[in-house]
Regions:
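Extracellular glycan-modifying ectodomains
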Residues: 1-134
Length: 134
């Protein structure tokens, strides 16, 4: 199954209810409205290997896929003191990740999950769970 949501709900569904491996790069992310529309409209034609990691001066970051879809990862945090990957589950059962190489970790997860998504080659079920301005 390939569930793609514009919020963290996809991660909860895959982890807590379906008990499946995360098989797309949209797990624990949010996607703004324009990017989500672009994703739905262009899903079959997106070049998933054409992506870039974008960072700002406030340690925020996202992955821009094929200049169409911006994936934001609010649960992944840069921590200069975290020499190894540290997980922390907050009160809302979000799994937050802290690491001093968080950007490399995000890119690795993006590549691994994208590869898995392309390999299973299953049409996605899109879930619009929230509206995000972008």
């Amino acid at each position: 199954m390939n569930i793609i949501s514009n919020s963290c709900i996809g991660g909860f569904l895959m982890r807590d209810y379906l008990k499946e491996k995360f098989n797309n790069p949209f797990i624990w992310s949010y996607i703004d409205n324009i990017s989500f529309f672009n994703l739905i409209k262009n899903y079959e034609n997106i070049n998933w290997l054409n992506f870039e990691l974008i960072k700002d001066k406030n340690w925020n970051f996202c992955i821009l896929v094929d200049n169409l879809v911006k994936i934001n990862y609010p649960h992944y945090h840069f921590d200069p003191n975290a020499n190894k990957i540290t997980f922390f589950d907050d009160d809302n059962q979000h799994r937050n990740v802290y690491y001093n190489k968080i950007w490399e970790y995000i890119v690795e997860k993006y590549k691994t999950r994208t590869e898995r998504m392309l390999k299973i080659n299953v049409k996605p079920i899109f879930i619009l769970a929230s509206c995000y301005d972008g």
